[in-house]
Structure formats: structure tokens, C-alpha cells
Amino acid sequence: MVFNTGAALLDAIVLAVVSKEEEGTYGYKITQDVRSVREVSESTLYPVLRRLQKDECLETYDMAYAGRNRRYYKITEKGKAQLNLYRVEWKNYSTKISKLFEGGIEL
């Protein structure tokens, strides 16, 4: 299975959070939104954002806010495709785990 509960899950959560804002969103807000579903430090999250940008799943732009620049992250078409793959993988994964917990899968 491609989907695991480590890096891929965090990538999926970040892409889902960023995809909610059509014009993109900034790092601190992404951190807060991700923390609403999974505990994560900024020192963990920013390398994920940089990697997703390097992988062309996210693009960035800077905009002035309160006298300083704020970096915004926006999902790309490649990022949307990756997010859709993660959604399918998550559905398969969570269905199997639910069946296992309910006793419906023979080991």
C-alpha cells in the first residue's frame, strides 16, 4: 500500500488544508489548521511545505502584510492530482482498518 500514517499522511493533510483556499494560504495558518487534526511542530511542517513545493505540488508567492512579507502556498494541478490519489488511498486504508477492528477481515 502506498499510503502510510507517516510522511504521506502529513503530505495529504497539508495538501487538503492548502486546497481549501483558492488563492492559497500562509504558513502559520497552515500550521494551525494541520494541528486541528494532528499534532505537528513548525520545524516539522516547513520542510514538508518546501518538499511539496520542490515536487511541484505547491507553488508560493509573497504578499505584504502588516509591513512585512508573508509567504503564501497554493496547490498546483499536480498537487490536486496527488491529493486525489491520497483520498483514494485513505478510503481504502480506512475501510480495511475499520473492517479489521469490527472483525470482518480474516487474517
PLM region spans:
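Accessory beta->alpha helical hairpin/"wing" motif in late/C-terminal subdomains of nucleic-acid enzymes
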Residues: 75-80
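A general structural signal marking secondary-structure boundaries and capping sites
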Residues: 22, 56, 101-104
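Short, hydrophobic-biased segments on the C-terminal half of alpha helices
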Residues: 46-51
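Beta-hairpin "wing" of winged helix-turn-helix
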Residues: 55-69, 74
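Amphipathic alpha-helical dimerization/coiled-coil segments
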Residues: 84-107
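N-terminal helix-turn-helix DNA-binding core of bacterial DNA-binding proteins
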Residues: 2-44
